[in-house]
Amino acid sequence: MNLENIKFKVRFLKFYTLFGLFGLTVEFIVRYFVLLIFSNDFFATFFGIICGVLFAYWSNIKFNFQIPSYRLKRALILFSLIGILSKFLQSLLSSAIGIDEFGYELQRLLTSSLIFIVFYFINVQFTFANRTQLGIAIYANNNEDLENIYSKVLDSPDFIQVDLVDKTVYKNALEVNISKINSIRERWPEKFIEIHLMTNDLLAWEIDIQNILPLVDMIIFNKHSYENNLQIIKKLKSKKPSLETGVYLDSSTNTEEIKKYTKICDQITIMGIENIGYSGQNFLESTIETVKKIDKFENRNKFKLEVDGGIDSTNYHKLRVDKLVSASSVLNSENSIKKVLEFKKL
C-alpha cells in the first residue's frame, strides 16, 4: 500500500471520527431538550440517538463516502442498525466497567471511544462498501506508454478500461494494437478489465475479441452492435459465461431506449463527452440529469451505471453512480494517485 493510499484511509478515519463526535453532540442536545419538554428519559434518549445517527450518516455520505444513489437507503438502514447495536453494547459495557454512576453524556463518550474502531471497520466493510469505483482509461494503440501510466497510478484504480477505437467511429483513430491488452493484464493482474469497443463493424473484430476473452471481464458495445450483432455477442458469452456485457450511450439517449438495454446488459455506460474516441474533452452537464433519470428506474439495482469521459474535480461528486472512468484528468495531474483517491471519495 503506497503512502497516498494510507493518507486517504487516515483521512476517512479522521472525518468519520469527527462526524461521530458531531453526531454525539446532536444526540446530547436533542436528548436534553426533549427531556425538558416530555420528562421521559427513554423517549428522549431514543429520539436523541436517532437524530445523532441520522446526522452522522448524512455527514459521512455528503463529505466522506461516495456511494451510488440507489444504495443510499440500504446504507441508511445498515448505519442505523449498527448505531443502535453500538448503543446496546455500550450500555452493557457501562455496567461491566462500573461507570453507571457517571452522567449520560460522559458514559456515551467513554464507551463510544472504547468500541469506536470496531464499528468504524464494520461500517466501512458493510455500510459504505459499495462506493463509487474509479477506473483509468487506456487506449489500445502504440501511442500509450504503459510503463509511464503504471508508474503514475500503480494499483490505485479500482478497474482498467481499455479503449479500442477504430476509424468507423473516429476518423483520426490510431491503429489498434490488440496485444496492448496482454501488456495491461500483465501490469494489473488482479484488476477488473473492461473493453470499451468503439466500432461500427463488430464483425471485423470478432476473432481478435475471442482471442483476448481470457484477459477481460467485460466488453462494452455500442447500441448498433447490440441491435445488429446479438449472435456474435451470444457466442462470446457462450465461450466465457462469466463475461459481463455493457452498452455505451450518449447522455441525450431517450429514457425509454435506455430502459430497453437495462434488461439485457450488465452495465449501462453513459458518455459524459460529445465525441467519443479521444480524451481531454469538456464534460456534458446533461449527463447529470440523465443519471438522475436512470436512478429512478424500477430495476436500478439490476445493472451497473457508469459515466465515462469529462470527469474532473468539478463534477465527479455530482455523479453518484457505480463507476466513473477518467483518463486525462488523472494522468495529467501532478499527483495521479492522489487524484484517483480523490475521485474514489473524498
Label each residue range with its predicted role.
Residues 161-178, 272-280:
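Glycine-rich, proline-tolerant flexible connector loops at the mouths of alpha/beta enzymes
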Residues 148-152, 201-213, 252-263, 309-324:
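Catalytic cores of alpha/beta
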Residues 248-290:
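Histidine/lysine/aspartate-rich catalytic loop segments that bind and position anionic ligands
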Residues 132-138, 160-162, 191-197, 217-221, ...:
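Hydrophobic faces of well-ordered beta-strands that scaffold small-molecule active sites
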Residues 219, 223-225, 270-279, 321-341:
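Glycine-rich phosphate-binding active-site loops on the catalytic face of alpha/beta enzymes
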